[in-house]
């Protein structure tokens, strides 16, 4: 039976885009796992298999993420992109790695908007193969985007607030008034606190 899976990569970083991806297939007859549990090399190898399946994705830039956080919420933005992906789905049944605390609420919203059978589950990227496949697409595409940004702006580490290298990069950029507007999420507390500390 044809099913689709949806997952995102890059929800939490202070630097770089978020990628939301969908994969659809009758069956996955090769090894997949939650992208976070795989090495980068393993993800890339599996990506070559997964990318041969029907898939769609969106790369969501920091400015759009900031705008959503200011006006509504990050969850609201993910709802919008999940809806867009579902409407492109080649199957009637879609599994989503749930980004809302309330699985049934998100299911209801997306079912009402799309008319499709939507099943939202926490840890679906770990437990459901088609969602694992989507997580690999999203993660590898985001990794590629991050490498492009590093080739322009220099090595900023992982882009996550917990990464000391990322924090040093941000602090250096703020002190030197470097133009990093296109890559940083200004609505993140990490960035706001650093800016506040150097006013």
UniProtKB/Swiss-Prot annotation:
A divalent metal cation binds at residues 7-8, 97. GO terms for biological process: DNA replication, removal of RNA primer; mismatch repair. One of its GO terms (cellular component) is cytoplasm. PROSITE patterns: RNASE_H_2 (PS51975). InterPro entries: RNase_H2_suA, RNase_HII/HIII, RNase_HII/HIII_dom, RNase_HII_arc, RNase_HII_hlx-loop-hlx_cap_dom, RNaseH-like_sf, RNaseH_sf. Its EC number is 3.1.26.4. It holds the Pfam family RNase_HII. Residues 1-199 form the RNase H type-2 domain. SUPFAM superfamilies: Ribonuclease H-like. It is found in: Cytoplasm. Its main location: cytoplasm. Gene3D superfamilies: Ribonuclease H-like superfamily/Ribonuclease H (3.30.420.10), Ribonuclease hii. Domain 2 (1.10.10.460). The keyword Repeat does not apply. Keywords: Cytoplasm, Endonuclease, Hydrolase, Manganese, Metal-binding, Nuclease. One of its GO terms (molecular function) is RNA binding. Manganese or magnesium. Binds 1 divalent metal ion per monomer in the absence of substrate. May bind a second metal ion after substrate binding. Its cofactor is Mn(2+); Mg(2+). Transmembrane segments: none annotated. It is an enzyme of class 3 (hydrolase). HAMAP family: RNase_HII_A. NCBIfam families: ribonuclease HII. Belongs to the RNase HII family. Endonuclease that specifically degrades the RNA of RNA-DNA hybrids. This is Ribonuclease HII. It comes from Picrophilus torridus (strain ATCC 700027 / DSM 9790 / JCM 10055 / NBRC 100828 / KAW 2/3).
